[in-house]
Regions:
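Non-globular, low-confidence helical/coil segments that flank catalytic cores
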Residues: 1-6, 137-151
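Proteins with a high burden of low-complexity, intrinsically disordered sequence enriched in S/T/G/P/A and R
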Residues: 1-2, 24, 103-106
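Active-site-proximal loop/helix segment associated with metal-binding centers of metalloenzymes
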Residues: 3-51
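Active-site donor-binding loop signature of nucleotide-sugar glycosyltransferases
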Residues: 13-15, 85, 145, 151
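Short secondary-structure boundary/hinge segments and terminal tails
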Residues: 21, 91, 128, 150-151
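Cap/insert and terminal regions of metallo-dependent hydrolase folds
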Residues: 39-41, 45, 49-56, 60-145
Length: 151
């Protein structure tokens, strides 16, 4: 974790593999001459705090949104007010959503958290987004490119 200033904190190397997306199985990293499954230690997440509210920005959330959120809560001492991230629940190699059981389990975890709003991008996938929307209701919104948000 690196606190850049009073408003910005970046962290990476998220531990835990709870509700890990199977879409990660096809993603590799080069280590020496080998290509093991990518552990995403390099993936960075950003906490932005302004006017007493904190937003988590987590890119495609390859480490799993549940694991990233837990790390963010450990850093903050509480849940962020909003999360902006793809949830990585669509497997582009196979052209399909992650299994309903995984999507539903992610939805249950997010529903039980104290985050006010989640905004998610393309790598969540349309089918997974619709399932999550049924669980999270107005707490979940889409994040198309060029959008403006107020937290």
């Amino acid at each position: 974790m690196q606190k850049l200033d009073d408003e910005l904190t970046v962290f990476s190397a998220v531990p835990g593999r709870e509700l890990w997306s199977g879409a990660n199985d096809t993603l590799r990293e080069k280590i020496g001459e080998d290509y093991p499954r990518d552990a995403f230690r390099h993936e960075q997440d950003l906490l932005v705090t302004e006017n007493g509210k904190t937003a988590l920005f987590a890119g495609c959330a390859h480490c799993g949104i549940v694991n990233i959120l837990k790390s963010a809560e450990d850093v903050l001492g509480r849940a962020p007010d909003a999360v902006f991230a793809g949830f990585h629940l669509y497997n582009p190699s196979l052209g399909k959503s992650e299994p309903d059981e995984l999507v539903d389990a992610v939805g249950e975890k997010l529903r039980g958290d104290k985050v006010a709003h989640y905004f998610t991008g393309h790598c969540t996938g349309k089918e997974a987004y619709e399932r999550l929307k049924r669980k999270l209701g107005d707490r979940l919104g889409e994040m198309p490119a060029g959008s403006d948000f107020t937290v």
